[in-house]
Amino acid sequence: MSNDSSECSQKLPKLKRILLKLSGESLSADQGFGINVESAQPIINQIKTLTNFGVELALVVGGGNILRGGRANFGNKIRRATADSMGMIATMINALALRDMLISEGVDAEVFSAKGVDGLLKVASAHEFNQELAKGRVLIFAGGTGNPFVTTDTTASLRAVEIGADALLKATTVNGVYDKDPNKYSDAKRFDKVTFSEVVSKELNVMDLGAFTQCRDFSIPIYVFDLTQPNALVDAVLDSKYGTWVTLD
């Protein structure tokens, strides 16, 4: 892929403002737990590259590298609502780490949380988002929606709507959307592009239904891509080699 800035600038306008959904595990090393700054550095570098191109970028990060909330095996000892609240706190930890890693690379970044923490996290306020993004500041959304029983996918779709994103980029470890599980079926077919209607009719796995429906209703395309590929985030904006676009038509 060319690094020529003039070539990049010709491709970027259709994705001037994006919402990137990251899993918590993307910040950890191979063990999948905790935060490993070396493992996360390629993500930081690519975010910096995109901001240098003039892309306005907001992030939603999960907390699965610390605690998977409702998926945690607590039996009947901890209520699901409490577990989800613990998961929201995990996303706050990841968001603070991302903010500082970005700032260390000269990228202006700020964390907004569904639940504020005095002296630490600002409460998410939709009317501020446009001003902050227009300044070139990367926004990192933490704390989910502030409610239990809601996935990080839904948080991502909600924030994408609030910021008026041109697209929601969902970073995964699979290079797009398949007609069946590629980890189980060697003949699984990958789609370069698929419509929202086809996802429903073919029962394809893109993201949770609430998030998917919200993106469809607000005409926000979804790009599912493999973050583990070299320079995959920058490619998602420029060339889209490592994933699948979900569009209205």
Swiss-Prot record:
Indicate how activity is controlled: Inhibited by UTP.
MF term (GO), any:
UMP kinase activity
Q: What class of enzyme is it?
A: transferase
Mind telling me which GO cellular component terms the entry cites? cytoplasm
Q: Which UniProt keywords apply?
A: ATP-binding, Cytoplasm, Kinase, Nucleotide-binding, Pyrimidine biosynthesis, Transferase
Q: What residues form the membrane-spanning segments?
A: none
An example GO biological process term is: 'de novo' CTP biosynthetic process
Please tell me where UMP binds in this chain: 63, 84, 145-152
InterPro entries the UniProt entry points to: AceGlu_kinase-like_sf (IPR036393), Asp/Glu/Uridylate_kinase (IPR001048), Uridylate_kinase (IPR011817), Uridylate_kinase_bac (IPR015963)
Where is ATP bound in this sequence? 21-24, 64, 68, 172, 178, 181
Per its record, the protein catalyses:
UMP + ATP = UDP + ADP
From the Swiss-Prot or TrEMBL record, state where the protein is found. Answer: Cytoplasm
Q: What is its EC number?
A: 2.7.4.22
UniProt pathway: Pyrimidine metabolism; CTP biosynthesis via de novo pathway; UDP from UMP (UMPK route): step 1/1
CDD domains reported in the protein's UniProt record: AAK_UMPK-PyrH-Ec
Q: Which family does it belong to?
A: Belongs to the UMP kinase family.
Q: What is the annotated quaternary arrangement, including any partners?
A: Homohexamer.
Task performed by this protein: Catalyzes the reversible phosphorylation of UMP to UDP.
**What protein name applies here?**
Uridylate kinase
Q: Which organism is it from?
A: Francisella tularensis subsp. holarctica (strain LVS)
The encoding gene: pyrH
